[in-house]
A protein has these predicted regions:
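Single conserved hydrophobic/aromatic residue that forms the stacking wall/gate
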Residues: 1-8
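Coil-to-beta-strand transition motifs
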Residues: 11-16
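Active-site beta-loop-alpha junctions of metal-dependent nucleic acid enzymes
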Residues: 18-43
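Short helix-terminating capping/connector loops at secondary-structure junctions
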Residues: 43-48, 74-76
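Hydrophobic "anchor" residues on beta-strands that sit immediately upstream
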Residues: 51
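RNase H-like two-metal-ion nuclease catalytic core shared by retroviral integrases
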Residues: 54-56, 63, 67-70, 79-104, ...
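C-terminal domain-tail junction helix/linker
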Residues: 106-184
Length: 184
């Protein structure tokens, strides 16, 4: 079975979440948005996702279903699309995608990975300090703005600086050696 990644970035902190999907469809994105809405609760979801900026991929072809809350008849967010061939409009996203490629080089298959593997990878990336965040990590910055309880709901864990690994061998299981993973 082919698996597809879905990432979402919180611009104020550069924290990125990533999810595996079993299809590259709008239904798979709606399922993730619904899950986030349920896990976070309406108030926190609305605070974190007032707007979703995305590309014009087919997985975002049903904006009304992404925008509306499934439990009550109201909108939970608003979808906006970047211009075609304009990745610079989501620059912070591209920086994190480059960090992902350090661990999973471009062209890597996600098919042997689990959500726990993806969460582990993102915990390492989100714990990596950035100059643009005044030498704080996305995890630390997000925690300052929104609190540890929200990070816990999102299955985010801080990785100590000395343990951060942004290399291919982080996910040894992917490369044929069984390993335990955290997160998920």
């Amino acid at each position: 079975q082919t698996l597809f990644p879905y990432t979402t970035l919180f611009r104020s902190s550069s924290l990125m979440l990533a999810f595996l999907r079993d299809a590259n469809t709008s239904a798979s994105v709606i399922e993730i948005i619904n899950l986030l809405d349920e896990v976070l609760g309406a108030k926190t979801f609305n605070s974190l996702f007032p707007v979703i900026l995305t590309d014009n991929g087919s997985e975002f072809s049903n904006p009304k279903e992404i925008e509306k809350r499934s439990t009550i008849p109201c909108n939970r967010t608003k979808i906006f699309y970047c211009d075609p061939s304009a990745p610079y409009q989501k620059g912070a996203c591209e920086v994190n995608h480059e960090l992902i490629r350090r661990i999973l080089p471009k062209g890597s298959s996600f098919d042997e990975l689990t959500q726990q593997d993806i969460t582990l990878m993102m915990n390492h990336i989100n714990s990596y300090k950035r100059k643009k965040l005044n030498n704080r990590s996305p995890y630390e910055t997000f925690s300052f703005y929104y609190g540890e309880d929200v990070l816990e709901k999102l299955a985010c864990r801080q990785v100590p600086a000395k343990d951060i690994m942004l290399k291919e061998n982080l996910l040894k299981k992917y490369f044929g050696t069984e390993t335990s993973t955290i997160g998920g």
